[in-house]
Structures are given as C-alpha cells and as structure tokens.
Amino acid sequence: MFGIFSRCDVRVQAAVTQGMQLKTIRDTGGYEFGVIWEPTLRQGSVLLKGEESFTLADIAMWRDLICTIEGVQVIATIWSAHSNIETHIPRMLVTFDAGGRKCDDFLTWLAKRLVYVYSPDQMELMWWPQEAEKVKEYASSLWSPDSKPKFPPIAELLKERHSAIQCDSAYRLAFEVLLTASMSEDIVQEFEQLVLSSELRDGEEIHFVELLRPTDPIYLEYHEDAQRYRLDGVVVISSTSHDQCEDFATDLVNSLSAHARVRLTRLFGRQHIGVLLAGGLPAYGWQHNEVFVTKE
C-alpha cells in the first residue's frame, strides 16, 4: 500500500501536503464546508464529523451507499481515543476525483452532490460537513499539536526517525493494517473496539483509520463477481515520550488476537503518512512514496 523508500529529507511540513489548498464553499443544503483541493492529483476531499450515537453497523451501511456515488475515490473512517476525552466521535474523509474539472468547476459540481454524501435519502443518519477552520484545526492537532494551526499544518519541532516521529512534544508511531475485502470484517471490528475500549494513560492517544477504495463502477458492470472495494488500515499511537510510546505499542500488539497481530506492520520510514491520515489529510500511500528521516 505505502510503496517504497524514495528519498530522505528533513522538513517541518510534509512534502505531500505542500500542494494542498483549503477552499471554502456552500452546498445546496446551506452548509459551509472546507474542501482540500489537490491540483496535481485533480482531487478534492471533505471532512465529515459524526455523532457518538453512530453504530458500527450504521457506518458500514452508509459507506456501502456512498461507494456508489459518482466521483467517490476514497472513504477514510477515522476512530480516535484520547486520555483526556471520554467521547468517541467518528470522522470521515471522503475524496472525490475531479474528473478533469478545474478547481472552480469541481467545487460547483461538489456543492450540488455533497448533501447526498452526508445525508443520504436511504438512511436516517447525518454527518456534519466541517468548515475550513475545523479542517485546519483537526489536521494541526495531529501534525503540530503545540503550534498555531495552519494549513497545511507546520510543526515548530518535527523529527522523523526510521521507526517514530516527534510532532512538537508528541511522539507517534504508525502501523499499517493489511486488509482484504473478503476477510477484513472481524479484524476491522477488533481494531475499532480496541480504540473504543482503550484505557489510556495520561497523554496517550490512539487512532485507527480504515481506508476504502471503491472499484470502478464500469469495471463492476463487466465483472459482477469482483470485489466492490479495496481496504487498507492505519493505526497511529501517541504518547509524551519515545519510550512510553514504544511501551504503548508493545501493549497494543499483545492485546490483539493472533489473526490481527500478523496483519500489523510498522510503517518504518513512513510515519508521517499515518499521522497525516489520522489528522484527516488525504496523504494516501499509493499516491505518495516520499520518505524523510532526520539525520542525527
């Protein structure tokens, strides 16, 4: 999923975010929302916030509906737990293919369709489109928690080593979860429950991101037995020191079933990809293969 090592660099802003632009538009439902526009990739992403009352079954049903909407390229479900926050509110990052449209044309196109994403007619469920300021704040809370929120986020202190990344005062580790559509349901539920039931020590966080890529509908027309989507997963854990973060990682691995454990791998050299995804930024590993590691 996350490609190969391609280069090393030292930055306080991830290279994959440098072309991202944060736009604002109002949709037909009257909501103002932020759109992350990526001109090189010709895609735009919106961040949606759910309710604590949403069940895992609700979210799975909603995603099945959203997969069929024109232009939907990726649906990323973000579950988070923090030591100082008792609620667990899911977020969704939905990325759309602009289909060759220029930015203004794409935003107009998206404004007419987004209501069918956050409030589909077939379900009594509504997500809340996040305004540009909320998108900026949430992304900064992962990448630059002690710095002033900016977009793209810039950390005052950032050190990425081969196995860990320090974002300001927070130390983070990222893992990839190897999933397949045919055998992922139990594993996904295990990681979701891990986040929802985690007993965290002071300063600890855990994030699980499930990435769903719908199969091209034209392809499905001619291959009825094909999988409707591809799945990948990312886990990001955080603490106040590197040693505590490693202890957290050990506890996490030991708490998993053997079946889930063998599908968990460290994102060596690519910790930044996991952190950005957990922060609601479309830094998809199959689109970006940059690596940067701090030289001692």
Predicted segment positions?
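Extended, folded cores of ATP/NTP-driven motor/assembly subunits in large transport
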Residues: 1-296
